[in-house]
Curated annotation (Swiss-Prot):
Residues 2-475 form the UvrD-like helicase ATP-binding domain. Its EC number is 3.1.-.-, 5.6.2.4. Residues 502-803 form the UvrD-like helicase C-terminal domain. NCBIfam families: addA_Gpos (TIGR02785). Heterodimer of AddA and AddB/RexB. It comes from the Bacteria. It comes from Oceanobacillus iheyensis (strain DSM 14371 / CIP 107618 / JCM 11309 / KCTC 3954 / HTE831). InterPro entries: AddA (IPR014152), DNA_helicase_UvrD-like_C (IPR014017), DNA_helicase_UvrD/REP (IPR000212), P-loop_NTPase (IPR027417), PDDEXK-like_dom_sf (IPR011604), PDDEXK_AddAB-type (IPR038726), Restrct_endonuc-II-like (IPR011335), UvrD-like_ATP-bd (IPR014016). This is ATP-dependent helicase/nuclease subunit A. GO terms for biological process: double-strand break repair via homologous recombination. The gene is addA.
């Protein structure tokens, strides 16, 4: 019985209104959601039917897990109350219940209402590959049309091209249209969103600032910057007022503060604000010599330089040109933007038309089609009216439950609102955590959650907010550490939510109390400053190492300490979730989280060199893998052999294996022609039988065969033929990394099959698709060659780790800068502010950002930083027992100096300007921890009394460690060192002595070792009943003793492709007849037509092939139903068919020649055709398809009994030993003669 907390119970049982459950990390939100569903189904009064609930999950896996949990609860309830009709009904409805992703729900709605949309109801969902190909095809056709002379708007089109693309290719134009299309489709009203882009630039002649909504973003940002300037001025001024402060600076600073205050008064008007900002001139500080503290004097100067620089930057960037000039620039761009939008709409129409013709959709189409069905035709963007279908769904669903609500986008929100009850007080139950909303790149809209989060806590709103803050994942020290960090980072400015008492993580898993662990959350700082470092004997220097290598070695050192060694160190103990007890730490308990995977390959290599098994699921590197390069080159040559580089690479590859001098000789055969023609000329000229000629002849024959296959067969078959005929697949499996290399080759085959399952065909188009992916910088990622349970340290992105948990988390690359590349493009896109382009003059060849561009950039920048704080929250909350953050910095001293400027900030949350100017996670976490009482050792000055008392009293217990990169110089793989020493001695002709005197004797002993149980090596440890029966038949030493006698024919069932070409063997016919007897109904005497009908059904169900079905003697089967044994079966006795068993028997009983005195046992396996319940036990029936002569004599029957005596005896022993019930009789039934023989028991 689960002990739910008060808040969890409230979330499970509260009803009657819209409910938002703000569930912190590790708070058991999925369990609560499932329990709510179960309790609604099991309620004593007015229980809900499961088909009256719509449950929306984020992934298919989550939906299936939820369905399984609900099913298990229903089965348990039904076991306790087997007569409940309601529970039986719920179980029958479960598989059809609406528990799915929103995309699956949309698919169901669209399929059922396809007639409304006038689309083919048999449409299929295309994958990303096919959609990419379709988009490219449509763009190619449209660009050809737009560039054509018949285009009436050619001049307008060229205007767009000249402003937004280079003269090298149309790639930028294509990407621009793709981006605008993708962004538009994230709106419930895509065409209206595009129209608004044009409206933004169509500024009237007489305009006011109120008509420029994007100006509010800039005003807010200027206000924040001026507040930051004021704060720095206040700090500087307060220092001048101290007893030994630089008081002679006070007057200048005070005057500058007054100017800033004046500027803040003009925030309502940009014109007046600009005037006041540009009037500010910073004078020089007094040069008067006074007796004051030099440190304080320097600090005031640095503070003044900081706010002066901040202010001057605003003057230069935002106020250098007046607003009228910026508006004029936008008016100039207006017609260009208008035509660009027309191009995007034309692309959308053409793309939609092509998808309709091919009857394919993507996930975005599903959402928009669903929306079209649910929205009444009279709806507008301002007033959304539900359609008849939507109102039917509102009546059907008594509650709509949404998991991971923080990741919902506007289209999905509109769909959910249309099918939920808007007439009453609401019936939506939403679960999520906005602090974990990290999918803005997928257009997730955290503001939807935040709006409800604020509104539902208002007493005037009937809706309810429930906070689940109790964390059941992590140890208390991990939670306290996370709380300490995020109280200083989250607020409504950045992170978009305050980290108040309701948002804090509360320790909930008391299981850890029984297993204390000294493992503080830790920040490891690595100083990579190579200056003033003494030279060491080590040849490797700090400069030689990348940051990734340094950090990887730091990880390795920590991991080795945690794992321990068999000789001297005890492994760290972690609590096993399944048992609740402590166990040794394993590699798979450790994860290394990175913001991106750019370092992953280097880190994995370094860890593996240190003997630490590691796996990184890379999203890049697939096309760079040598085996993929070779295969793509081969495919290119098959497509067109007159491609010199691919052809040369294939000839040089292990597939053909020519050396450089051989390739040179071929080139000399014809220097001017293509390399393929040079190969042909070489073969014509060279009449000898050299290795080169043999290799080239073999290659040309192979190439001709493959080119023929490419014209006639499928692409995937061609690829597999290459693997098989060249042996390349086996070859790469035998070289280092073979498992991964083969996985990559299989992935190429799978991707080719996926390509062919689309509406596209052909080798050329497949290769062109791959080339375009490479041109756009896309990669497929190496194929996965690792199971989830393998004991390795995993490297993954923070995004991949969401929803997972690990005993130990290493968060690496803390000092890697945030990715801001998107903020410097020619154009920026924002869901609310639209499309902001730099002003581009193609004639003067100049471009510069407009004020509108600055506004959109600032909004995107703030959104990006808010997301980064949430990503950091996800990372820190993955840890169950130990959290280690690692950052490598060029100079710790300079970092500490920067961080210490704000440690005395008078509130918990770090200043907004400081957080916004931070470029790395370390620049957030570092100053936060520098305020911690545990950081006294690393502070460069005594600032303890300047920190807030509540911060000093915080219960978190952090460990801050500082190392130098030099500490990781001596961590080269020891085996490599030994190899290097050995090579050096051999090179210098020095004697090589072994370190162990007894090494020779040890080697001799191992080479002459004899296994103590020789006899066990020549007898099988596992036997089938059929094989034992064969050994009894053939009384010779060969069959009786050899463990693996040579095979004289195919073992087991032949593959389907062979079955289609050959006749069935007698054994295969027998197997087919056994399949028929296994699946035929035994409820009455079957006639021949009934038997034939059932066999056809088995073919349709793919239980039999057509050839197997045709081999069945239907007359023989029909005769079986007229036997005495069949009558017993039909009479209703308990009967089991195809009963598998395994039993252990002493080897001496199984093998007549067994002479060993050991207690060896043999595993016997078999399958009993039919078991029939008798009065006091069981009857065994075994079907035989042996051909026997007509009217067999009693002597012949005795021979048959003798042949199968061993088999039937083993069957009897198995049933009696396993089922603990006696076997009364054992029978053989021979179909060829309708003969039933009883086999007596032989002890």
């Amino acid at each position: 019985m689960v002990n739910w907390t008060k808040e969890q119970e409230e979330a499970i049982y509260t009803s009657g209104s819209d409910i938002l459950v703000a569930a912190a990390a590790g708070s058991g939100k999925t369990a609560v959601l499932v329990e709510r569903i179960i309790q609604k189904l099991l309620a004593e009064h007015n229980p809900t039917n499961i088909d009256a609930l719509l449950v929306v999950t984020f992934t298919n896996a989550a939906a299936q897990e939820m369905r399984n949990r609900v099913g298990a609860a229903l089965e348990q309830a039904l076991a306790a109350n087997p007569s409940s009709i309601h529970l039986k009904k719920q179980l029958s409805l479960l598989q059809r219940a609406s528990i799915s992703t929103l995309h699956s729900f949309c698919l169901d709605i669209v399929k059922k209402n396809a007639y409304i949309l006038d689309i083919d109801p048999s449409f299929r969902i295309a994958d990303d590959m096919e959609m990419d190909l379709l988009k490219q095809e449509v763009l190619d056709d449209l660009l050809e049309e737009w560039y054509g002379d018949s285009n009436p708007n050619q001049d307008s089109f060229f205007e767009v091209v000249n402003r937004f693309t280079s003269d090298r290719s149309d790639a930028e134009m294509e990407e621009l249209i793709r981006s605008l299309h993708t962004f538009a489709m994230q709106s419930p009203w895509p065409n209206q969103w595009l129209d608004k882009l044009v409206q933004t630039y169509n500024i009237p002649e007489e305009w006011t600032e109120e008509e420029l909504p994007w100006m509010n973003v800039l005003r807010d940002e200027v206000s924040r910057q001026l507040d930051a300037v004021s704060q720095e001025i206040d700090i500087a001024y307060s220092i001048t007022q101290e007893a030994d402060g630089p008081y002679h600076y006070a007057k200048t600073i005070e005057e500058e503060k007054a100017i800033i205050q004046e500027a803040l008064k003009n925030m309502e008007s940009w014109k007046y604000l600009q005037q006041s900002m540009l009037q500010v001139k910073f004078g020089k500080l007094s040069g008067k010599k006074v007796d004051c503290d030099e440190e304080k004097k320097t600090k005031v100067k640095k503070l003044r330089d900081s706010y002066k620089k901040r202010f001057q930057k605003m003057q230069e960037v935002w106020f250098a040109r007046n607003l009228d000039a910026h508006v004029y620039d936008m008016r100039v761009l207006a017609p260009v933007i208008k035509h660009l939008v027309e191009l995007v709409k034309q692309f959308q129409d053409s793309f939609a038309k092509v998808k309709k013709e091919k009857a394919v959709v993507d996930f975005s189409d599903l959402e928009h089609y669903c929306l079209q069905i649910l929205i009444d035709e009279s709806s507008t963007e301002e007033e959304v009216i539900p359609s008849t279908v939507a109102m039917q769904l509102q009546r059907q669903f008594t509650e709509v439950l949404v998991d991971e609500y923080q990741d919902t986008n506007m289209v999905q929100e509109t769909i959910l609102q249309l099918i939920s009850d808007r007439q009453g007080s609401g019936n939506m139950f939403m679960v999520g955590d906005v602090k974990q909303s990290i999918y803005r790149f997928r257009h997730a809209e955290p503001s939807l959650f935040i709006d409800k989060y604020k509104r539902f806590s208002n007493s005037d709103d009937p809706s309810i907010r429930i906070d689940l803050a109790r964390n059941f994942r992590s140890r208390e020290n991990v939670l306290l550490g996370a709380n300490y960090i995020f109280r200083q980072l989250f607020d409504e400015d950045l992170g978009e939510i305050s980290y108040d008492d309701a948002a804090e993580l509360i320790y909930g898993n008391k299981m850890y109390d029984d297993h204390p662990l000294e493992a503080k959350p830790e920040l490891l700082l690595i100083d990579n400053n190579s200056e003033d470092v003494e030279q060491s004997d080590n040849e490797e220097t700090v400069e030689d190492l990348e940051k990734a290598q340094i950090e990887a070695r730091a990880y390795a050192k920590q991991i080795k300490n945690w794992i321990g060694t068999p000789e001297d160190e005890i492994p760290m103990q972690v609590v096993d979730k399944a048992t609740g007890k402590q166990r040794d730490l394993q590699y798979k308990d450790i994860v290394i989280l990175m913001r991106s995977m750019t370092w992953a390959s280097t880190i994995a290599d370094e860890l593996q060199q240190q003997g630490i098994p590691t796996y990184a699921d890379l999203s890049t590197g697939y096309f760079e893998a040598i085996e993929i390069k070779v295969m793509l080159s081969f495919l290119k040559v098959i497509d067109n052999p007159r491609q010199d580089i691919p052809l040369a690479s294939i000839l040089r590859s292990p597939i053909i294996g020519l050396e450089e001098d051989q390739l040179a000789s071929i080139r000399l055969a014809d220097r001017k022609a293509s390399f393929y023609e040079a190969v042909q000329r070489y073969l014509q000229n060279e009449q000898d039988n050299s290795d080169t000629v043999k290799s080239l002849i073999r290659f040309m024959e192979m190439l001709n065969d493959f080119r023929q296959s490419a014209r006639q067969g499928s692409l995937s078959e061609l690829i597999w033929d290459i693997y098989r005929e060249t042996g390349y697949y086996d070859f790469v499996g035998a070289i280092p990394g073979g498992k991964q290399r083969q996985a990559n080759l299989r992935a190429l085959y799978d991707r080719a099959r996926g390509y062919e399952s689309t509406s596209f065909r052909g080798l050329y188009r497949f290769l062109r698709f791959i080339e375009r992916m490479e041109e756009r910088g896309k990669d497929l990622g190496a194929a996965r060659a690792l199971s989830e349970q393998e004991d390795v340290v995993r490297i993954m992105t923070i995004h991949k780790s969401k929803g997972l948990e690990f005993p130990i988390v290493i968060l690496g690359g803390m000092n890697k800068e945030f990715n801001q590349r998107d903020l410097s493009e020619k154009y920026l896109l924002h869901k609310d502010l639209g499309f902001a382009s730099k002003y581009i003059d193609p004639v003067k060849r100049i471009q510069y950002p407009t004020l509108y561009y600055h506004a959109v950039r600032q909004a995107k920048f703030r959104d990006m930083l808010s997301e980064e704080i949430r990503v950091l929250y996800v990372a820190l909350t993955r840890a169950k027992e130990k959290l280690l953050m690692v950052g490598t910095v060029p100079s710790i001293e300079k970092k500490l100096e920067k961080w210490q400027r704000i440690v005395d900030h008078p509130s918990w949350v770090l200043p907004a300007y400081f957080r916004m100017e931070s470029k790395t996670y370390l620049d957030w976490v570092g100053p936060a921890l520098l305020r911690h009482v545990g950081s006294e050792k690393i502070r460069t000055e005594n600032i303890g009394n300047q920190v807030l008392e509540s911060i000093n009293q915080d219960p978190s217990d952090w460990q801050i460690t500082m190392n130098h990169a030099l500490d990781y110089m001596d961590m080269k793989d020891s085996s490599m060192d030994n190899d290097d020493n050995l090579k050096e001695k051999v090179f210098n002709w020095e004697s090589v002595e072994t370190e162990q005197e007894g090494l020779k004797n040890d080697v001799d002993a191992r080479l002459s070792y004899e296994y103590a149980y020789k006899q066990a090596t020549v007898f099988r440890a596992k036997q089938s009943v059929t094989e034992l029966k064969r050994q009894q038949e053939v009384k010779d030493d060969y069959s009786d003793q050899q463990i693996l006698p040579p095979s004289h024919g195919p073992i087991g069932k032949r593959p389907n492709f062979l079955q289609k070409k050959l006749k069935l063997s007698p054994a295969e016919k027998g197997t087919a007849l056994h399949t028929v007897m296994q699946h035929l109904p035994m409820t009455h005497v079957l006639s021949e037509p009934e038997i034939e009908e059932n066999i056809e059904k088995m073919v349709l169900e793919e239980k039999l092939t057509r050839m197997e079905a045709d081999s069945i003697n239907i007359r023989a089967v029909e005769r079986f139903f007229h036997t005495e044994i069949a009558s017993k079966i039909i009479s209703g006795n308990d009967m089991h068919r195809e009963v598998p068993f395994s039993i252990m028997l002493p080897a001496s009983e199984v093998y007549a020649n067994w002479k060993d005195q050991s207690n060896e046992k043999v595993l016997i396996q078999g399958v009993i055709d039919c078991l029939l319940q008798a009065d006091t036990g069981w009857i065994i029936l075994d079907y035989k398809t042996d051909f026997i002569e007509d009217n067999p004599t009693s002597q012949k029957e005795q021979e048959l009994i003798h042949r199968y005596q061993t088999q039937m005896t083993l069957y009897r022993r198995a049933i009696e030993q396993i089922w603990k019930q006696p076997v009364e009789q054992t029978y053989l039934y021979f179909f060829s003669q309708q003969l039933l023989i009883e086999v007596p028991y032989r002890d």
